[in-house]
Amino acid sequence: MSASVSPLAPKYYPAMPVIHGVRIATAAAGIKYKGRTDLMLMVFDRPAEAAGVFTRSLCPSAPVDFCRRNLVHGKARAVVVNSGNANAFTGLKGREATQATAEAAAKAIGCATTDIFLASTGVIGEPLDAGKFSHLLGDMAESATEDFWTEAAKAIMTTDTYPKVATETVLLGQVPVTINGIAKGAGMIAPDMATMLSFVVTDAPIKADALQSLLSKGVGSTFNSVTVDSDTSTSDTLMLFATGTAAERGAPEITDAADKRLADFKKALGRVLKSLALQVVRDGEGARKMVEVEVTGAKSAASAKKIALSIANSPLVKTAVAGEDANWGRVVMAVGKAGEPADRDRLAIWFGDIRVAHQGERDPAYSEDATSAYMEGEDIRIRVDLSIGRGKATVWTCDLTKEYVAINGDYRS
């Protein structure tokens, strides 16, 4: 956790409502950090429906492998998350640590290890000593409360500078249902299936298969559209749980993601996922500016997204933003290197509402002073129109500063 809060941090945090059927506890286990919580336990009083998406890294962490196996059952009784150690690339010791943690959690809750989900975040390659925290899980299960969401978000932080929380309440069959979410992430953010770590819970009675469909679709325009440094974590985990307790108030049980009664719920879930994803970007390591990259007029949506990510991941573009330099030529470079269809002589580029390039050259009305003044803001929008099709996409990133280098250069010290 950083000593200073990002200037892009939210000005206020939402009051996180209680979701019946789920309780949370945190503890300071001293896994890596001193004087702060680094362990989170989420307990479901009754089996919750479970869905998840995980990293596509070919070097996944032991907890990711464990979660994938358990997700087949579609039920959850507890989630255990530790920060400070990723338990990735740790071989047999890593697998033993996950098993020991799962067994301790199952004993504390009174369930099978197949109902336990695990996540770890932190340094890669260092064995995780489950003995530092497994003995705490029993007391945590007893003391867990329903109104501990922000504290849970704090416990899973690493280089984050603020906790990331989001909530929405929406009607399902005329009954209010709630969606709460927490996330962590500040570096190694270029998710292919999720983000670093994020956990979302609803009291809506939605079955696991439908929940999985909702989540898999929801990540496309949210967590799969953000990048801080183009590095995909070995530990990326996003899970969605449904306690179903709203059924006691008359909410209908949903078994199919295509159920029309889910229309408002889908939108609310999308807002929660987007809020969490953008909070991750705004807390990018060393970030001082948020950058939205919009690409229109591409051959396809997939092509537009690849071009947008080429721009968003370009160190030259990101450092230009950090230096408040209106160097639009770097955007041209990033479009050209993306490997997607583009026509130089149809290309147009905007910084905010200022068109800086048009039809293969600098815009005749270009003003260096006006564009430079725009670049001084905290929220920067780069728009590119290829004018060769109807594909469009939007991604989000942050600038690349000296602080990013310092944070990652000192990460293990």
Curated annotation (Swiss-Prot):
Gene that specifies this protein: argJ
Protein's job: Catalyzes two activities which are involved in the cyclic version of arginine biosynthesis: the synthesis of N-acetylglutamate from glutamate and acetyl-CoA as the acetyl donor, and of ornithine by transacetylation between N(2)-acetylornithine and glutamate.
InterPro entries, A to Z: Arg_biosynth_ArgJ, ArgJ-like_dom_sf, ArgJ_beta_C
Marked site: Involved in the stabilization of negative charge on the oxyanion by the formation of the oxyanion hole: T121, G122
Lineage: Bacteria, Pseudomonadati, Pseudomonadota, Alphaproteobacteria, Hyphomicrobiales
Residues holding substrate: T158, K184, T195, E285, N408, S413
Entry annotation: catalytic residues: T195 (nucleophile)
Gene Ontology annotations for the cellular component aspect, listed alphabetically: cytoplasm
UniProt record, GO biological process: L-arginine biosynthetic process; ornithine biosynthetic process
UniProt-recorded name of the protein: Arginine biosynthesis bifunctional protein ArgJ
UniProt site (Cleavage): A194, T195
Record pathway: Amino-acid biosynthesis; L-arginine biosynthesis; L-ornithine and N-acetyl-L-glutamate from L-glutamate and N(2)-acetyl-L-ornithine (cyclic): step 1/1; Amino-acid biosynthesis; L-arginine biosynthesis; N(2)-acetyl-L-ornithine from L-glutamate: step 1/4
Enzyme superclass (EC): transferase
Source organism (scientific name): Brucella melitensis biotype 1 (strain ATCC 23456 / CCUG 17765 / NCTC 10094 / 16M)
Listed Pfam families: ArgJ
Subcellular location: Cytoplasm
SUPFAM superfamilies referenced in this protein's UniProt entry, alphabetically: DmpA/ArgJ-like (SSF56266)
Oligomer and partners: Heterotetramer of two alpha and two beta chains.
One GO molecular-function entry: glutamate N-acetyltransferase activity
Domain of life, source organism: Bacteria
EC number: 2.3.1.35, 2.3.1.1
NCBIfam families registered for this protein in UniProt: ArgJ, PRK05388.1
